[in-house]
Amino acid sequence: MPYQAIINIILIFGAAIAVIVVSKKLKMAPAIGFILTGLIWSAVAPTALKSNDELKLLSEFGIVFLLFMVGLEFSPSKVGRLVRAMFVGGSVQAILTIGVTLGFALMGLISFVQAILFGFIIIQSSTAIALKIYQDRGEIDSPHAETSIGISLFQDISTVLLLILIPFLGANLTAAGNSAFIVAGRGFLILAACAAIAYYFLPVILRWVVLTGIRELVVLLALFFCLGFATLSQALGFSMALGAFMCGLLLNRSEYHPQIIAETASFRDVFLSLFFISIGLGYNWQFAVEHFLPVVLLTVAVMSAKTVILFISTRLVGFPFRTSLLAGVGISNIGEFGFIIMIAALPYGLITDYQYQMLGNAAIYSMLLTPFLIVGISKLTLRFGAKSLTEKKRGDTFKTRPKDCHSWLRAGRTASFSSAQVFRNSLQNHRS
């Protein structure tokens, strides 16, 4: 890595520390702080960092680890608890949203392939931002938070399915569409075959590694398979994120996946922070100034439409008015998975640079607005509506806040110690 690239990364992390501290004081989610860091640097040094290939590579690792952790943490029991919000609410949201975008295709404004793609991009939400706000407000166990999580699980699955379909959708738009379609199909079969083989051998290898008693080997093995599957997926014409997700699912069936999650969390957080920073770095200030009004109108239209659609979706499932409204507002933004889809679609010509800039800017604005909307709508519904079940049980605890501002440090240390204890217990159980 060139010396200048290292200097750039040091400067970015230094700026991120300052911005995150300020964001914490303002009660903002860390993801917003990272995006603001990128926005500041894109204004201060518009050319020094945007062309930095090493930084882009590190941010791609953030995407890889994000999908890896999604696969690793995918829990059938969690799906069972949230099945109503996940499959019914999530599918209704997807159908209604794609129905709206298909209307633009019928008017001849975009192609039908783009209508489907844009529909999937728009339904994605940043639960990292919403859940952080819910956690800070003591609402993490509230009905609207659980509803948001359920719908987000459906969105995660839809992202993975779309990452599989993008090469096939792109093949239809190329001159050599049939041959490209065959190549994509062959690549998917090879990837599926490798996954089937790994399905049987990964748990055996992981068990052997745990029996060695060397914790570092668990981390190295997880990183090796994660990056290995990601690289294989890209070599076969798919995204690295898809391969990482498949690897996470394969390791998920192992009895040791809790300590894999704990041991690799620090890697994920570092690279994921770079991904959010890169979102801000990609902000084109000149484009934003020249197209300010259209971007603002698009942001308002998307957030309003998503709130209404999510409200309708959750009400049809049977959730009460306040839960549906707060869930709709909380995930009305276009989240990080929307960027992942757009980045994957760009090389295939499924989305133009202009469309990427418009949707990307709207996504950034929507994520920055989400905390204020959640707080505002929550206060509004408390003033004019009935309290939620969580509030009735706890009283007005949503206004209370942790007294210890360093509680997250203790939580991190506790997670680390718990991971070590889980590792030792697993090792003792196998040796006994």
Question: Predicted segment positions?
Answer:
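Transmembrane helical cores of multi-pass secondary ion antiporters/exchangers
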Residues: 1-411, 416-424, 431
